[in-house]
Amino acid sequence: LLQGIALSSRAQEQQMWQRYHDKCRREASIIDTLPSKLEKALHWSPTINKEQKEVIRYILWNMVYVEGGTANLGDNNNYPVDVASFFINRYEVSQDEWYVIMGENPSNQHRRNYPVDQVNWFNAQRFTQKLSQLSGLPFRLPFEAEWEYAARGGLKTKNFIYAGSNNAEQVAWFREKYYNTYVSKETGTKKPNELGLYD
């Protein structure tokens, strides 16, 4: 199973995490300039460490407000659903974020800003529960209707075939086009949809 995988040295791994933390620190510092409402809403756990705090601030900075509305969802757009307003992250959860919050990286190939893989719904639930425990904020997974509504662009939808474009290559990585493999790609590298959501 490990054939063809190069494991990084400890020094390389430390440099990788340092670059990631520096990036988080730079981007998370922006959130500190927002009104103190957000900071007041946070109730940091006494067990939280500095890196976890930075990651949670980074996640919050990348939350996108999705205004609620009525949409026709489902494969044939024939299932009308009322969706309340909510927030959703503009990116998939990265391996870095998962590692800092959960203390492990279950992914097959460890790559810093790639989406976490080898996790199921229960693992994802544990991740959101841990975010809530550490921050005091009510993190959760989106409901299926919320996810589809956001992927389609919410009230800003232009009714593209795919989430953000009629050309799948602009917005998605797909197996047939990329050497017939199941390799994940770095988050946020394709065009976002109408709400600014990637991947």
Regions found by a protein language model. Give the residues of each.
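Classical Sec-dependent N-terminal signal peptides that target proteins to the secretory pathway
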Residues: L1-L7
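Boundary at the C-terminal end of the N-terminal hydrophobic targeting segment
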Residues: S9-A11
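Short N-terminal segments immediately surrounding and downstream of signal-peptide cleavage
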Residues: E13-E27
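Long amphipathic alpha-helical scaffold segments
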Residues: K40-I48
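A short glycine-rich, aromatic-capped structural motif
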Residues: K53-S107, V119-F122
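Functional-site microenvironments in short loops/helix caps that host divalent-cation chemistry
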Residues: V66, N72, S107-H110, P115, ...
